[in-house]
Amino acid sequence: RIGGARPMSEEWIVETHDLVKKYGEHLALDSVNLAIRPGATGLLGPNGAGKSTLLKTILGLIALTSGGGKVLGHDIATEGAKIRQRIGYMPEYDCLIPDMEAIHQVRYSGELLGMNSSSAVQRAHEVLEYVGLRDQRYRAVSTFSTGMEQATKLACALIHDPDLLICDEPTNGL
C-alpha cells in the first residue's frame, strides 16, 4: 500500500510515514508513505525516481531528512544495525572483492553480520549451492560473469537466513 499516512502497525513488515530525504536542495524522497505486508513486493519506477534511496533509507544506511518508519518492528532512524541483522540486502552496485573466491566472499559477509567463522563457512557452502554456484565457489569473483556476480551477491544476502530479503536491481546487467 503506497500513499496515505497510517499509524504504525504490527501487520506491516515495512512501514513509513511522511518519509523525506533531501540531498542539499534536491528532493529524493517526498513524503513517502508506504505499508508492506509479508510476501513478495516489487518497487517499480524510472531511473532517478528514488527507489534505491528508499531502500537504503529503510535499511538505515542513509539518514532521513524527516519522517519515520519501521522495518520488522525496528525504527529506521535509530535501529539501522538491528534492521540490517535481520535483512538480507543485495545491492545494485558492485560490492564484491574481485580477487576473493566466492566462498570466502560469502563467508566474510556472514562474519560481518555476526556469524562465527565456522558457521559462516558451513552456511556459505549451503547458500552458494542454493544459488547455483557450488562448482564455482573456489573461483575468484573477478572471473565471474555478471549473472554469477549477481548470484554471489544473493548468496551474501542469504548467508544469515534473513527474515526479509531486499534486492536492489537484482537483474541489473543480465
Question: Where are these predicted regions, by residue range?
Answer:
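Conserved ABC ATPase "signature" region
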Residues: 107, 111, 118-136
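Hydrophobic anchor residue at the start of the ABC signature
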Residues: 154
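Conserved catalytic motifs of ABC-family nucleotide-binding domains
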Residues: 161
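Conserved ABC transporter NBD signature motif
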Residues: 67-78, 82-83
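Walker A (P-loop) phosphate-binding loop of ABC-type ATPase nucleotide-binding domains
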Residues: 46-50
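Catalytic Walker B motif of ABC-type/P-loop ATPase nucleotide-binding domains
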Residues: 165-168
